[in-house]
């Protein structure tokens, strides 16, 4: 929670190697090396934010947030520019810190992949925003989408989140919708269901929640500044 660029500087990232991964994936997508291969890309709204934990572990003020970014390896200029971008829309530094982490680690890299692939193949993007009723403080955290998608609501580690009937019913409803999209995509290369899942180039993402819906593309709002700063 204290090191947002961790996935870019630590071992848990793609490593270029001539025998296995000879080219940066972003460059390969941009050049059309995966042309003709349909893609679904997306992320969860609070991948690594955990709103209730940010209240305890997030930075107490913007100065502390800047210090954390400096400790993670960002230059002062980039750290200040990054925080200025988030400060415009999120006045609370704790909440902003959660968004910074989510955007840097998963949301923006996923949407960037969709943007790069969209000219070359049918590409679809989503944002998973479902929060388990009664556990809203955990947010739509990393991996939560697996419970409704595979229907393993009463298996560990998800069991405590779905003991309530309301939580089970909502997750089961969402899971049926998700499986319809995912299986038709695997079969036909197009995620079929209702609402219609538009192509990413049409400017919308599918919002996976109860109820389902569409969202305008978040890239420019959430990720444009990160790309300008060279953080994507």
Predicted features by range, described:
Residues 1-169, 181:
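Substrate-gating cap/lid region and adjacent catalytic-acid/histidine neighborhood
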Residues 65, 100, 185, 197-200:
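Enriched - but not universal
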Residues 90-93, 158-162, 200-205, 209, ...:
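A short alpha-helix capping/helix-coil boundary motif
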Residues 131, 153, 211-213, 231:
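Generic structural motif
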Residues 171-193:
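Non-catalytic, well-ordered alpha-helical segments in soluble enzyme domains
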Residues 188-216:
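Mature extracytoplasmic/periplasmic domains
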Residues 213-232:
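Tryptophan-rich aromatic "cage" segments
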């Amino acid at each position: 929670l204290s090191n947002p660029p961790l996935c870019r500087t630590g071992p848990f990232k793609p490593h270029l190697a001539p025998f296995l991964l000879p080219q940066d994936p972003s460059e390969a997508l941009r050049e059309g090396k995966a042309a003709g291969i349909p893609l679904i890309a997306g992320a969860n709204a609070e991948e690594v934010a955990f709103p209730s934990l940010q209240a305890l572990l997030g930075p107490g003020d913007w100065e502390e947030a800047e210090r954390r970014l400096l400790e993670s390896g960002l230059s002062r200029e980039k750290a200040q520019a990054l925080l200025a971008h988030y400060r415009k829309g999120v006045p609370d530094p704790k909440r902003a810190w959660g968004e910074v982490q989510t955007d840097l680690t998963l949301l923006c890299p996923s949407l960037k992949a969709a943007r790069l692939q969209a000219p070359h193949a049918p590409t679809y993007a989503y944002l998973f925003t479902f929060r388990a009723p009664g556990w809203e403080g955990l947010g739509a955290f990393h991996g939560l989408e697996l419970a409704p998608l595979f229907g393993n609501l009463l298996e560990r580690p998800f069991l405590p989140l779905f003991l309530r009937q309301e939580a089970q019913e909502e997750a089961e409803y969402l899971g049926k919708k998700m499986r319809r999209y995912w299986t038709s995509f695997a079969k036909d290369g197009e995620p079929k269901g209702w609402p219609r899942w538009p192509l990413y180039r049409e400017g919308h993402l599918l919002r996976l929640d109860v109820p389902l819906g569409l969202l305008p593309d978040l890239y420019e709002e959430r990720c444009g500044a990160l790309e300008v700063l060279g953080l994507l």
